[in-house]
Amino acid sequence: MSEIFDAKAFLKTVTSQPGVYRMYDAGGTVIYVGKAKDLKKRLSSYFRSNLASRKTEALVAQIQHIDVTVTHTETEALLLEHNYIKLYQPRYNVLLRDDKSYPFIFLSGDTHPRLAMHRGAKHAKGEYFGPFPNGYAVRETLALLQKIFPIRQCENSVYRNRSRPCLQYQIGRCLGPCVAGLVSEEEYAQQVEYVRLFLSGKDDQVLTQLIARMEKASQDLAFEEAARIRDQIQAVRRVTEKQFVSNAGDDLDVIGVAFDAGMACVHVLFIRQGKVLGSRSYFPKVPGGTELGEVVETFVGQFYLQGSQMRTLPGEILLDFNLSDKTLLADSLSELAGRRIHVQTKPRGDRARYLKLARTNAATALITKLSQQSTITQRLTALAAVLKLPAIKRMECFDISHTMGEQTVASCVVFDANGPLRAEYRRYNIAGITPGDDYAAMNQVLRRRYGKAIEESKIPDVILIDGGKGQLAQAKAVFAELDVPWDKHRPLLLGVAKGADRKAGLETLFFEPEGEGFSLPPDSPALHVIQHIRDESHDHAIGGHRKKRAKVKNTSTLETIEGVGPKRRQMLLKYMGGLQGLRNASVEEIAKVPGISQGLAEKIFWSLKH
């Protein structure tokens, strides 16, 4: 127990009402957030002589201050707890690393509805289908729907400004409602209804209606129409045959858990309208000494309740672990959803099979993750030995990319003890230097990255400079001039130069810009981690450079036209669907864009044609 914190005096002031407590260390950092039905009883349990676990002992030893927020109900306490966890990210709480909202397929409520991927709040008028496990699953489904039910997927700005059909119409993936006379209102509405039924899991109704239409077309001797509908029927059947189908109407999230070597994997299986939409594995950050029950309970609460990114709730949640707060969780979710949400921990029949599947997937994903982490750990340990460091907890690497000196981009990638930390990758647009001057680019990015206050935990142990002696000299010069509150001598600056043939395994490493470097054997684990982070940095820089180059390519022609500033350029590209669409547009079409006069439209048309 902390000698500074007076637990007895504090507990005398605590109420027995429900609420949330926040524990702080000597530095004023929130180290733990918890909730309680009875705050006094719960907080008293931390200051007994026989604590429940080593984790609790370590936590209590660091407490210097506790804040308490009283709530009206346990449900309020549960919601507030998870909002605080998301806000403070306390190191003694189990933390859900990936808190992105799940994507949905959106069917708009326009006169001619469109299909699109959607994340976040559902403000737009229309229908939402999902959730899907990731953006790839949505894009794959949209591509499939476009082949079977050719309704539009273009933005409204593009749709409203077309006078002739686009390429999607030419290849049969859109009915072309943007141009009058290409498709009847009835036919388009019918295809939209098929999409609605299909995404709602009512495949049989889609097939029944299509078969009836095909037979009628045959009777009317409209054989081309009958053949088109026949192809549509076959496409729907091919898709439905591949899908794993559960009981019709099942609307479930199935959560399986695996726990080993201090690491947890939570696998979530999404079933909507009786179909498995997909699944996803999570690896929450687990403080040492945490029990599996706490991992499951905290994960489920964070997964469904945290902040504005609240998940779409299914009718039922299946778990393979008993929760002490199961009733409270179900009541809280039901209150949020405005309907009854069931939390089931002992399912039978098909539901038990789903749970077994989720548990198996969790175990498999955890084995893979542990294997990868073991490899990364071995490589970082080997590199630390080569560099004579006690350990490497964080490593950063920089690379520069440009084309003939133009659109220069610098990348910074970050590795921690578990490997790539992609959420902390950064790109820097480099400006104000002589084109092609990589040294100046490196100088600029290092000053921008390190010439400011940095949290203790984010100071790298190793900074890898791709480019050899010259770039390393720039890095040394920058660090010599830094005037910062953190220890600028802590990071080890390491230069890496590719061999004469630029082949992997022939790299030379430099501690200093002067003198000879040294090489590592091609099979060295230390070399492998250097190659890994350098390749990540190179790919990240190239990706950023390509995006920047593409952006410039799309706007450079317009930038030369007098009277077309940034806002008008953006409006033109948006309404015409890109530079190619603008090149193909007539003067009359260009003049329809907001803010573009007839005279300016003629000038734009002439400039693009010549």
Swiss-Prot record:
Query: Keywords of this protein's UniProt record, alphabetized?
Result: Cytoplasm, DNA damage, DNA excision, DNA repair, Excision nuclease, SOS response
Where in the numbering of this chain does the UVR domain appear?
204-239
Q: Name one GO cellular component term.
A: excinuclease repair complex
Q: Which GO terms describe its molecular function?
A: DNA binding; excinuclease ABC activity
Signal peptide span per the entry? none
Specify the GIY-YIG domain's residue ranges.
16-94
In Gene Ontology terms, what is a biological process of this protein? SOS response
What Pfam families would the database entry show?
Answer: GIY-YIG (PF01541), HHH_5 (PF14520), UVR (PF02151), UvrC_RNaseH (PF22920), UvrC_RNaseH_dom (PF08459)
Q: Where in the cell is it found?
A: Cytoplasm
List all membrane-crossing ranges: none
Q: Report the family membership.
A: Belongs to the UvrC family.
Q: Which PANTHER family match?
A: UVRABC SYSTEM PROTEIN C, UVRC/OXIDOREDUCTASE
- Assembly mode: Interacts with UvrB in an incision complex.
Checking HAMAP family in the record gives: UvrC (MF_00203)
Q: What does this protein do?
A: The UvrABC repair system catalyzes the recognition and processing of DNA lesions. UvrC both incises the 5' and 3' sides of the lesion. The N-terminal half is responsible for the 3' incision and the C-terminal half is responsible for the 5' incision.
Q: What is this protein called?
A: UvrABC system protein C
Species source reads Salmonella newport (strain SL254)
- Give the lineage: Bacteria, Pseudomonadati, Pseudomonadota, Gammaproteobacteria, Enterobacterales
Which gene name does the record give?
uvrC
